[in-house]
Amino acid sequence: MSVINGVKVKRNKLQFSRLTNLDGQYVREKIKSFLQEDGSEDDITTNYSVDTSIKMEAVLIAEEECVVAGLSILPHCFPKGIIIQSFIMDGDIGKPNEVLARIRGSARTILNRERVVLNLLQRLCGIATKTRQYVECTQNYNFKVLDTRKMTPGLRMFEKFAVAVGGGYNHRLDLSTAVLIKDNHIISAGGLEPAVKKIQDSKIGRAHV
């Protein structure tokens, strides 16, 4: 039991998790919406310049040293018939000019998806790399690197996944995960004490204050 600003609060030790795997169906649905946003099916440049019979091989190469994140979701970004070969695992260090993966199949399919897929992978690798830097700076201290809910709308689970791959921990996945009283709650509830009391009286068994 702790006293915060005169309010008695029972402290529960929070157990922070790591979202190191993304559900395949979730990824496919998100990628589908990203592709629709980009108009991939109506890619007039590719559709009018590349014959449907043309095959190609795309090579993913690291431009600089980074913590790789997102290769595990590549199979969910392309339809059947596209062959994906990864040479490194999520969480591993990619070296400059290192080949991370190869993608083989229909040139049209690969070309009308490449920008969406690359944008996502580059973002995830960037987050994982920056997280790893923070983790390495704090490895001699007794605390964990956590993310927040201040994430890109529509990309939350992907970005939390990247944090976990980089060695960090995930805080609240969403608003239903745990109680987190902030200034605006205190003001709206009429003070810290009534805010805490209302939550305690609600008997939310899974909530952490």
Predicted segments — roles?
Residues 2-206:
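Acidic/glycine-rich phosphate/pyrophosphate-binding loops and surrounding catalytic core
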